[in-house]
Amino acid sequence: MPETMDISPRNNHRVTFISALLVVLFLLLFAVDRGLFNHLIDTSYVWSAQHFGWFWQIFMLANFGVAMFALTRRGAGRKLGQRSEPEFPAFQWVAMVLCTLLAGGGVFWAAAEPIAHLVSPPPVFPEAAPLSNQAIDQALAQSFLHWGFLAWSVLGSLAAIILMHLHYERGLPLAPRSLLYPLTGEGGVKGWMGDLADIVSALAVFAGTVGPIGFLGLQISYGLSEFIGTRDHLPMQLGTIACLMAVYLTSAVSGMHKGIQILSRLNIVLGLLVLAFLFLAGPTQFILEHFGGALLTHLAWLPQQALFRGDEAWLSAWTVFFWGWFIGYGPMMAIFIARISRGRSAREIILLMSVVAPLLTMAWFSIIGGTGLGLEAANPGTITAPFEGFNLPAVLLAITGALPFNTVVTLAFLVLTALFVATTGDSMTYSLSVVSSGTDHPPRWLRLFWGLTMGVTAMVLISGSAGGIGKLQSFIVVTAVPVSLLLVPSLWGVFKAIKPPSD
């Protein structure tokens, strides 16, 4: 019999109340004193990047290294979650995992980031002239760092395995507080430290989800306005976010086996169709050549890329920002992965999260971003002219506009972006509700509460000023400071979690 512990899940009204209160105070400050709001966010962002950026870089590399080592351990083949067979078939499992993270980068960043690095090459590499052939592989390789092995590994390998062990085999809550157990034992999980862990994790993923809802909602609105030839004004932006909110709320309320699963499958199918078209209609040979070259560059330079500290201003705008974003997502994403991975082994989870998903994401970036790079190489100015002034939203439309059947392709990308955002919205609504309710099956009213709160927050920030969503994305990095400390015990706790019971 597995060892159990008397820490029963409960309705954690205190965590819900404090988290919601802090969100309200955040919005009140935004509404009352915009100057003070901006100053506090900017100052906190700079402080977090300066004092924790180096730590995050080391932690991200260490987390991936420990995951690769844990993969080889004898206990890694043991089924987790108190099930002998997986709850979800392989395709559905992979679809839900991929769609939840790719919301932020699946379309927008895959198109824009490689071009940004082509125009302004990353300082970690030996000097390459902007827009040169050498800069192409380096641009993709830098994108691979930000969306590849290290990013995926922190989102659900070690932490998810620990939560599955502690929740399903030891009786601890399926909540961020349980990640404290390898360090503090029962006392830290049950006391104020546990409440604090849940609150900061809730705020981090709240900011990390509202950011993409608002930011990508603006990109969809911009794309629609260009598509139909009208002005991109506030009512269109708010209407776009309201539609996104309606989709992910419907999905989240319908449950894990219905809405979330169906939306993820639809997302994957449409994504594969779009990728196939881009690969065949775009610069196919260019994509294949530079995917291979960029992957080899990334593997050869991975330690240098991960630990580069030569340009702190560049790091805070790119690598440290992404690391803060993904670390902030870590505990809540781990809850989601733990819930959908019952009946899977630690080895399966690590392989998917730390190897397979990163490679699929790199291929995704190579096809979407590589198409833009190839179009630019063949006809200089095709992509960089619309991108001038760091106009990131214009890159995707420039790519689709240069392809055959551009009207259909543009519309498909806008729908795909909406589906990605909705998939992350429903998944994180579910995770927040799990923490708030203390049960794997949170009530519908609680899912509605968190889903509505995220959507309304995005609308308020957009209505208030052009930079509101941008400030929220900076706040993501601030919340990652305490969350990163919460994830550290996973580096050694995973070995206890995968240890066979007989040992």
Each model region followed by its residue ranges:
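Membrane-water interface regions at transmembrane-helix termini and the short interhelical loops
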Residues: 2-10, 34-48, 67-87, 138-147, ...
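C-terminal membrane-solvent junction of multi-pass transporters and transport-like membrane proteins
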Residues: 11-18, 76-95, 285, 289, ...
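N-terminal alpha-helical transmembrane segments of multi-pass membrane transport
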Residues: 2-135, 276, 490-501
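Hydrophobic alpha-helical segments of multi-pass membrane transport proteins
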Residues: 22, 55-73, 271-282, 360-370, ...
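Flexible loop linkers connecting adjacent transmembrane helices
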Residues: 2-7, 39-45, 72-90, 115-140, ...
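Extracellular loop-to-transmembrane helix junctions
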Residues: 14-21, 47-63, 94, 136-168, ...
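Membrane-embedded translocation segments of transport machinery
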Residues: 188-196, 200-344, 351, 356-410
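Helix-loop-helix module between adjacent transmembrane segments
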Residues: 6-31, 64-66, 103-106, 146-218, ...
